[in-house]
Amino acid sequence: MIKVLIVDDEPLARENLRILLQGQDDIEIVGECANAVEAIGAVHKLRPDVLFLDIQMPRISGLEIVGMLDPEHRPYIVFLTAFDEYAIKAFEEHAFDYLLKPIEEKRLEKTLHRLRQERSKQDVSLLPENQQALKFIPCTGHSRIYLLQMDDVAFVSSRMSGVYVTSSEGKEGFTELTLRTLESRTPLLRCHRQFLVNMAHLQEIRLEDNGQAELILRNGLTVPVSRRYLKSLKEAIGL
């Protein structure tokens, strides 16, 4: 089965696409969203294979949503748009495909056929992974999306419910990015299997008898350090 998530702020547009997709035996619609906050949360929770994403939405566009998703776990993106084919060329590098509104059944069939072919090759995504260093981390919290500058990030932690970013002020937000992505694309250092820390916020390292340690940050918060990563942290501060 191909798991599909529909994101469009227009209820009628979502309904029309839903009706077309429900006629496909191998398609499972796992959810529908009307805005960016709902969409990012649903992608993390539902892990769809394909995201049918409207480009023009209030406040945060479909293009911006794509940039907030973790490249390592990003689904196939099929943009939905009322733009003509000349404008669409600007979007092709970001998407697996696009569909013009109103969506034609024959055109949708072509998209689904291509998706089936790609899945049979076990390709995870057609989107190129951007390996440039991140200047900020996209976070969600309290029904909003905000960009936390790297200088303001104190540490990042991974839990059963996802990955969370803690700011220098102690405020916490959820991010779609994985620890692995953040470790490779930010200055954050691994100090524990479930933690990354911004060494610029470090005040002291408190050593323990069992060979482990604890980081004390300038905001008073503490971060655990496992024996495996203690040596690299000491080297990072010149010890």
From Swiss-Prot:
Q: What domain of life is recorded for the organism? A: Bacteria
Keyword check for Nuclease, yes or no.
no
Question: What is a single molecular function from GO for this protein?
Answer: DNA binding
Query: Cross-referenced SUPFAM superfamilies, in alphabetical order?
Result: CheY-like (SSF52172)
User: Which terms are listed as keywords in the entry?
Assistant: DNA-binding, Phosphoprotein, Transcription, Transcription regulation, Two-component regulatory system
Modifications after synthesis and translation: Phosphorylated by BtsS.
Domain Response regulatory span(s) in chain numbering: 3-116
Q: Report if keyword Transcription regulation is assigned.
A: yes
Domain named HTH LytTR-type: which ranges?
137-239
Q: Which residues carry this modification: 4-aspartylphosphate?
A: 54
According to its UniProt record, what is one Pfam family this protein matches?
Response_reg
Q: Per its database record, what is this protein's job?
A: Member of the two-component regulatory system BtsS/BtsR. BtsR regulates expression of btsT by binding to its promoter region.
Q: What is this protein called?
A: Transcriptional regulatory protein BtsR
Q: Which organism is it from?
A: Salmonella typhi
